[in-house]
């Protein structure tokens, strides 16, 4: 009976973790293969002031609309100590356009100025609780989650953006205060999980 209780508690804890991180949680590091063939971890960046982990892909129209914005962000903020790491969480057997080889092509075409890595085993995105591409997680230098959601308030048109959620959250961190809002709704395509069986 005691064994059954422990088993049910363990199973229950698995389900409780499916929601992923919330602001204030500490995110675990990862080691994922980048399009240049190197393994990338947050621990590689010893002097980082924070990290922007964005789950994105090649195939989603919303993700494509944010590529130039992510490039511009990386150019502006990497020198300020905020490291952007883009993670493709999609399974290539479901979305062939999101294969590692196609990621390499896309990164070269768009001249990405940030690491673009592949969550091939699909172990990282569930930990974070990412559900869309794109889906952004801002972490401080200690990997404490500070903001989750959309980059800004206009997925369709960068010229019409009124609220820059991610940049505002970083400004809050720079001032030593908590970002408000700490969460927004991520707008994008659902992440394509590997089909079982």
Regions found by a protein language model. Give the residues of each.
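Loop/turn elements at helix/coil->beta-strand transitions in domains of secreted/extracellular proteins
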Residues: 48-51, 79-84, 111-115, 141-142
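Short active-site neighborhood of thiol/selenol oxidoreductases, capturing the structured segment around
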Residues: 41-64, 84, 170
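Bacterial Sec-dependent N-terminal signal peptides
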Residues: 1-20
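Structural microenvironment flanking redox-active thiols in thiol-disulfide oxidoreductases
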Residues: 64-109, 120-127
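Short, internal strand/loop/helix patches
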Residues: 103-140, 146
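N-terminal "domain-start" segment that seeds a small globular fold
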Residues: 14-43
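Thiol-/selenol-based redox modules, centered on thioredoxin-like
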Residues: 138-197
């Amino acid at each position: 009976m005691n064994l059954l209780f422990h088993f049910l508690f363990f199973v229950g804890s698995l389900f409780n973790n499916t929601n992923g991180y919330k602001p204030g949680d500490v995110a675990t590091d990862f080691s994922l293969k980048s399009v240049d063939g190197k393994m990338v971890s947050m621990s590689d960046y010893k002097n980082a002031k924070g990290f922007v982990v964005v789950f994105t892909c090649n195939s989603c129209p919303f993700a494509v609309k944010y590529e130039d914005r992510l490039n511009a962000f990386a150019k502006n903020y990497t020198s300020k100590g905020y490291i952007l790491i883009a993670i493709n969480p999609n399974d290539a057997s479901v979305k062939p356009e999101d294969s590692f080889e196609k990621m390499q092509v896309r990164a070269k075409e768009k001249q990405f100025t940030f690491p673009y890595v592949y969550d091939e085993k699909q172990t990282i995105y569930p930990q974070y609780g990412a559900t869309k591409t794109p889906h952004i997680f801002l972490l401080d230098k200690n990997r404490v989650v500070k903001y989750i959601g959309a980059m800004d308030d206009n997925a369709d048109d960068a010229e019409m953006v009124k609220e820059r959620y991610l940049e505002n959250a970083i400004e809050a961190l720079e001032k030593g205060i908590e970002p408000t809002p700490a969460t927004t709704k991520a707008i994008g395509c659902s992440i394509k999980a590997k089909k079982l069986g």
